[in-house]
Amino acid sequence: MFKSGSGSLKRSGSISSVKSFSGDSEKGLPPISRGSVSIASQNSEPLIVPASSSSFAATSDFVPEKTKSEGNLKDKSSVITGNFGSSGPINAHTNQNADGDRLVENLLLKESSKGRGSGTSDARHTATDSRLSQEVKQSFSEENAGGNDLNTGRGSHGTGDGVEQHYKFDCEEGMSAYHKRVVDTFFKYFEYSAEDGHSTLYSDVMFLSGHGDLGLLVMSRYQELMTLRVRSAIYGIFCYLQALTAYLTYFDAKVGQAIMLDEELEKYEIRLDVAQDDDPIVFQITTGVFTSGVAHDLRKLTQILEAFSLER
């Protein structure tokens, strides 16, 4: 469960999530390049979380870099605007599932029908694309009458020791039905295996704020068998959006942008504009190369973000 603190929020702080990845030495698998998901105010120094174990990396190596110039950024940007809040206008998503469902379905099916080009003609991806349309159609053709049974297609990803259930209550409880429907559909798409089999991901996720006025919002540790690390980045995104909107209402982010900073390095960032401040919150995703399809998968991630940019 999220734990809220008391007191005023200091804008000089940051919220950071750090993820480290390990390979399988017995199987000869190399360590997977570490990735990070971070949110920080552009005017402040990021909060440094010291390493507490071999699988927990300090944030100092993964702090989003200052953008070199707005001009360069705009040249490579794919800007997406829309409402990212979980209260107020975001409820329109849950009340207008038909519109949202059609948008997400069209986005995913359109991309699926395009194919991947010569650079990503992987047979695994082709097989995944072939079943994507049916899974998406099935998911969005089922009406969410009860509003709660939205976690299908995930049981096989847990470790069998209650970790998945622990994550569910930590991060998913406050998600809107619309968020869950999109996430579930997106996760199904990533159920293909990595070339060298499953990789074990150890994640330490911390939600921290300011100089302690709100204190530790959430600290959850979980490990899960993952078929592709991009799924972890998606976990982080929706956890963060939920934490920001549900417990850091001071930010009251109304408009978001998904920007591709560097396609070759697979570097993306999300900017959340803050109503009370001209300074946007920067939410950056950086990953290394793991499979030939990672760049494509991150483009899918951008499409998911676009699904939340419905004009109201």
Curated annotation (Swiss-Prot):
Residue ranges, compositional bias (Basic and acidic residues): 63-77, 122-134
Biased composition (Polar residues): 78-98
Keywords, alphabetical: Host cytoplasm
GO CC term (a single one): host cell cytoplasm
Domain of life, per lineage: Viruses
Keyword Lyase: no
Subcellular location: Host cytoplasm
Biased composition (Low complexity): 1-23
Hydrolase as UniProt keyword: no
Region spans: Disordered: 1-37, 62-99, 111-161
Family the entry assigns: Belongs to the phytoreovirus non-structural protein Pns12A family.
Function: Constituent of viral factories. Binds to ssRNA and dsRNA.
Name assigned to this protein: Non-structural protein 12A
